Every structure is written in C-alpha cells, then in structure tokens.
Amino acid sequence: MERIVTPAEMFEDGNSELSLRPQKINEYIGQDKVKERLNIFIKAARNRKEALDHVLLYGPPGLGKTTLANIIAKEMTGDLKITSGPAIERAGDLAAILTTLKDYDVLFIDEIHRLNRSVEEILYPAMEDYALDIVIGKGAAAKSIRLDLPKFTLIGATTRIGMLTSPLRDRFGVLCAMEYYDETQLKEIVIRSAAVFGCKITEEGALEIASRSRGTPRIANRLLKRVRDYSEVKSNKVISLKEARDALELLEVDNQGFDKVDNKILEAIIDNFNGGPVGIETLSYFIGEELGTIEDVYEPYLLQKGFIVRTPRGRIASDKAYKHLGRVNNKNNNSNKGQTSFFK
C-alpha cells in the first residue's frame, strides 16, 4: 500500500492533477524566483521570435515541474510532449520523438538523469544546433547524415541533479531550483483546489491541510481529496478546522506531516537505541523496512526537517525528535552536529 504522504506520483493523482494544473504563469502559486526568471525569458524569446532556451528543473518530487513545463509550452504557443528517461531505451526512440516536433514545441523529459549514454549523445547536437545526426550503414560504408530539427525547447526534470553528466547539464541555458513550499503558499493551493473540486473550505481548514503536506503541493491536493471524502460522509457542507483535523488524524498524518513509519523510525532511534547513533542497516532490520526504502523514501524528509542527523557513526535523533514524541533527552550528545544533507 502506497503512503498518502509520498511526494511521488500515485495512480490516483493522474486525473485530478490534470484538472488542478494552472494554465498560465501568473496563475501558478509559489516558486516566485523561478516564475520571475521564466516569465522574463519567455517574453524575450517571444519578442525575438525564437525558441526558449533549454530549461532544467531540479528539486524534490511533487513540486510542480510538469505543471511548469505545460505552462511554458502554452506561453510559447507550442505543444507539449512528455516522456521520461527510463522510457527512452534506444537512440532511435528519441530520434522518433524529435522528428515529430514543430517550432516552439516543448519536449519534457522527466527523470532525465536516467537517460543512458547513447541516448544522451543524440541530444547534444539536437540541443546545440537543432540537428539530428543519423548514421546509415555499417563499417567502412557507414556515413553520417544530418537532419535539421525545428526550433524546440527541451525541459529536463530531475530529483538528482548530481547524477547528470556535465556535458548534458552544461547544454541547458536555464537552470531552476524548485524549493519546498511554505504553509501560506500551500494554503492558497488548497483553497484553489477546493474551488476546482466544488467543495467549500475555511481558511483554518485549508491551513491545517497545508501544515501537514510536507511542503509539497501534490501531497496537499491528495490530502484535500481525502478530507473532502470525510467531510461529505459526515454531512458537513464546509471543511472546517475540526473536520480537517479529524480526517487527518484518521489518516494517521500528524501535525508534522509524518505517518506511522516516520514516527516508528524516530521511536526506534530514541527508545531502542538511546537516541543513536544507530547504523542504517540495524535500523532497517529493527523497523522491518528495506534499507533503500528508508534512505530514499523516509529519511530525506526527516533530515530536511531536522528530526534526525546523519553522522559517520550512524543516525542520531535531534532535540526536535524528542520534543515531537514527548520524550526527555537526557543524553549528553550534541544532536545538532553531523551530516544533515541527504544528498551526500
């Protein structure tokens, strides 16, 4: 069963995300620095009747990269074609996509860091010269033919910018870091989404959902749908603070946006390992979750929020973790020191 607070896209998100997506850049909530830069670059490109420079969007999942790509395509009056790194297995697959593009179209490649090298090399002349180099024949008889491509924009999206090769990364003219949303921005998103869904919600109810959404619009919209279900069954015409809080408690999403496993990890470190340090393999065995799942799914948000600290000796629970669980930290260790980045 998938976690309701996962930032990754779930099957149920598909149709609702399409209906909730803003269509213009001025309708897009949050990411103000990214919006301002893109707005200027888009207007400049349109004035010169040129394609927008290739754009790389990087940051955690669920923050609106696909939505931004859709907006850019509309602002440039082009069509959006969506694919992903894992879906493009051979160079011929990418060549087939590139040859269907028209001027000002946008090609969006999600998880672009997962492109294999032979496919990636096809992109180099396509991005630099709007050209596609095709080799015909084999051996001594082989010859290369260059096909002209339309003036398109490539938008790459990645959650792991460090995994991109330098030649690919350097070919993007615009790099945009997507950041987590604050509660005020998420509250606006929840209120807007509620209007699209046709349900009424108070500002307090929207803020309660926003505060448990882990800084991620995708999670906020998913929680709103479940709170709406709860409110309708309880015959409440408006989602108030009480309805939102009761529904989220039923879903076992606490006031930090943590679910059962998040809290289980904190409890294990504090109650069973005296606050740490504890090795990730030991922790994995103790809570019954795969090591990779802890590192990729659960740990990043706990690190980002400062509830655990990663050190060379293992994971340590911070003072925030003790306070969150209502425990007293009697251990004389400085839990605020250590490696807090989950990108290393």
From Swiss-Prot:
Residues the record lists as binding DNA = 310, 315
Positions contributing to Mg(2+) binding = 66
Q: Which reaction does it catalyse?
A: ATP + H2O = ADP + phosphate + H(+)
Q: Specify where the region named Small ATPAse domain (RuvB-S) lies, as residue ranges.
A: 182-252
Which GO biological process categories is it annotated with? DNA recombination; DNA repair
Supply the EC number(s).
3.6.4.-
Q: What ranges does the record give for the region Large ATPase domain (RuvB-L), renumbered to this chain?
A: 1-181
UniProtKB keywords: ATP-binding, Cytoplasm, DNA damage, DNA recombination, DNA repair, DNA-binding, Hydrolase, Nucleotide-binding
| Gene Ontology cellular component list | cytoplasm; Holliday junction resolvase complex
Chief location category: cytoplasm
Binding residues annotated for ATP, in chain numbering: 20-21, 62, 65-67, 128-130, 171, 181, 218
> Which Pfam family, any one, appears in the UniProt record?
AAA_lid_4
Compartments in which it is found? Cytoplasm
Chain spans, region Head domain (RuvB-H): 255-344
Which HAMAP family does the protein's record reference? DNA_HJ_migration_RuvB
Family named by the database record: Belongs to the RuvB family.
Please describe what this protein does: The RuvA-RuvB-RuvC complex processes Holliday junction (HJ) DNA during genetic recombination and DNA repair, while the RuvA-RuvB complex plays an important role in the rescue of blocked DNA replication forks via replication fork reversal (RFR). RuvA specifically binds to HJ cruciform DNA, conferring on it an open structure. The RuvB hexamer acts as an ATP-dependent pump, pulling dsDNA into and through the RuvAB complex. RuvB forms 2 homohexamers on either side of HJ DNA bound by 1 or 2 RuvA tetramers; 4 subunits per hexamer contact DNA at a time.
Any domain commentary? Has 3 domains, the large (RuvB-L) and small ATPase (RuvB-S) domains and the C-terminal head (RuvB-H) domain. The head domain binds DNA, while the ATPase domains jointly bind ATP, ADP or are empty depending on the state of the subunit in the translocation cycle. During a single DNA translocation step the structure of each domain remains the same, but their relative positions change.
Q: What is this protein called?
A: Holliday junction branch migration complex subunit RuvB
What organism is recorded for this protein?
Answer: Clostridium botulinum (strain Eklund 17B / Type B)
Taxonomic lineage: Bacteria, Bacillati, Bacillota, Clostridia, Eubacteriales
